[in-house]
């Protein structure tokens, strides 16, 4: 699929145009210069033709970080098919903008000069100030007023290939669940998890090495890596194929202490949570060179909150196996709610042991999406209740009639009971442990939901 890249200095409106063309808010927009530090990607349709739209980091030489962004942006432009170079129509053209535009023009790719913030008839006169760029294709637009964007879209469509009709999957396995169960009482096989992309969110506090880990996983310098805390603001998307499986990685914004979350980063935190709602497996990155913090524990709680498959990644590891065992014990003690999560040590910058993450992701995804046979499930539950009967409720017998899995990703199991409100959390934990002993459930949560006979899923009781 062809790639279209948006290039320009910070705060000229690239992210706003990106959101306008994508018809949804993907990139974070702000009046703060340089909000987009990493490249964002989205598949869009322009006049019936599909392409990948790339929102690059702002070009600015005012700091070392933005020099890195500039180098990455220019490299990304060379691998694109169409370039949209964006400038601020309310500012005077400068030599640097012209120099970069000339440099990009040498690539012999279709390139348009997009003059943003032409918000009125008076502003239209400013377009003439950019004549010395020598652009054959100039468009005065106002993203905020949505003027001129249609003309730009028509030009863009002329330089895109015809939309390719992708053959539909031969099965109908991508429909929604059919009433959750089939006639035999088993969970319906309506979703083909084997062919779906595995969505992986990389989470952790600022500067623990999330971007370095993403770069190591996809074997290229993708996210901007810097010692400046909080470099990644936009969640960074990367689609990568490994051993026949497609992985969608998202490097989420680093999370700071609550008191330090301000403005744009608060929005980034909200975006992070929204992304985790759509994630299958979370890579919780910890900095092994520093002591565990309360914030680490809070972030781990986010993964638990969204009931994701989880791998705990100890980054910057250069210690002995004995020290690894000690730290694992500390993590298990601090993160009791993630006791099911495997722990792996890596050095993202050096690429050490990073390759071991892929098979772990695949294993956990398989566990996360598995369907447990109802007969086997009830066999385990029956043996567990026989070995350790449920406590009575004020002398009254508490029974589990049967259990059935009604959802995958995460695994949700309904316990059909006579007194669902009387199931103590400690007995839930006991049943969960028994299920883990009997089935492959490494790295994934198990949600047990006690329900009264005839109770609907909407009335489920946590």
Curated annotation (Swiss-Prot):
Region forming the signal peptide: none
Keywords annotated in UniProt: GTP-binding, Nucleotide-binding, Repeat, Ribosome biogenesis
Role, per record: GTPase that plays an essential role in the late steps of ribosome biogenesis.
Domain KH-like: 370-454
Quaternary structure annotation from Swiss-Prot or TrEMBL: Associates with the 50S ribosomal subunit.
Name of the molecule in the record: GTPase Der
Binding-site list for GTP 1: 8-15, 55-59, 116-119
Pfam family, one: KH_dom-like
S-S bridge residues: none
EngA-type G domain span: 2-164, 198-369
InterPro entries found in the cross-reference section: G_ENGA, GTP-bd, GTPase_Der, KH_dom-like, KH_dom-like_a/b, P-loop_NTPase, Small_GTP-bd
């Amino acid at each position: 699929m062809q790639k279209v890249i948006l290039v320009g200095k910070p705060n000229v409106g690239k992210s706003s145009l990106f959101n306008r063309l994508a018809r949804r808010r993907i990139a974070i927009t702000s009046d703060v210069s340089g909000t987009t530090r990493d490249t964002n990607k989205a598949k869009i349709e322009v006049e019936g033709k599909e392409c990948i739209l790339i929102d690059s980091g702002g070009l600015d030489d005012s700091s070392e970080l933005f020099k890195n962004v500039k180098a990455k942006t220019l490299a990304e432009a060379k691998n694109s098919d169409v370039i949209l170079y964006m400038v601020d129509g309310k500012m005077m053209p400068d030599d640097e903008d012209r120099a970069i535009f000339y440099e990009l023009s040498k690539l012999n790719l279709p390139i348009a000069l997009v003059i943003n913030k032409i918000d009125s008839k008076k502003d239209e006169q400013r377009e003439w100030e950019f004549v010395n760029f020598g652009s054959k294709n100039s468009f005065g637009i106002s993203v905020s007023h949505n003027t001129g964007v249609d003309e730009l879209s028509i030009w863009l469509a002329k330089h895109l290939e015809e939309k390719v009709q992708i053959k539909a999957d031969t099965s109908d396995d991508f429909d929604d669940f059919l009433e959750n169960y089939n006639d035999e009482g088993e969970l319906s096989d309506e979703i083909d998890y084997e062919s779906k992309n595995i969505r992986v969110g990389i989470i952790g506090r600022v500067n623990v090495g999330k971007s370095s880990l993403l770069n190591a996983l996809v074997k290229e310098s993708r996210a901007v890596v810097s010692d400046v805390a909080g470099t990644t603001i936009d969640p960074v998307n990367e689609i990568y194929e490994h051993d026949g499986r497609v992985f969608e990685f998202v490097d989420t914004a680093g999370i700071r202490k609550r008191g330090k979350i301000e403005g744009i980063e608060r929005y980034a935190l909200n975006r992070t949570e929204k992304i985790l709602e759509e994630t299958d497996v979370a890579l919780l990155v910890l900095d092994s060179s520093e002591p565990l913090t309360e914030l680490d524990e809070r972030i781990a709680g986010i993964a638990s909150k969204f009931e994701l498959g989880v791998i705990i990644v100890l980054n910057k590891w250069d210690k002995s196996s004995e020290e690894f065992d000690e730290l694992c014990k500390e993590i298990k003690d601090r993160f009791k709610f993630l006791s099911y999560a495997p722990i792996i040590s890596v050095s993202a910058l050096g690429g050490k042991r990073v390759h071991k993450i892929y098979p772990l992701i695949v294993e956990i995804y398989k566990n996360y999406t598995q369907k447990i046979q109802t007969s086997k499930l009830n066999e385990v539950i029956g043996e567990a209740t026989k070995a350790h009967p449920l406590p009575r409720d004020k002398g009254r017998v508490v029974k589990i009639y049967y259990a059935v899995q009604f959802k995958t990703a995460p695994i949700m199991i309904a316990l059909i009971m006579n007194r669902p409100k009387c199931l103590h959390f400690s007995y839930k934990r006991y049943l969960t442990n028994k299920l883990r002993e009997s089935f492959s459930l490494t790295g994934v949560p198990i949600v047990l939901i006690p329900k009264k006979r005839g109770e609907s899923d909407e009335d489920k009781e946590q």
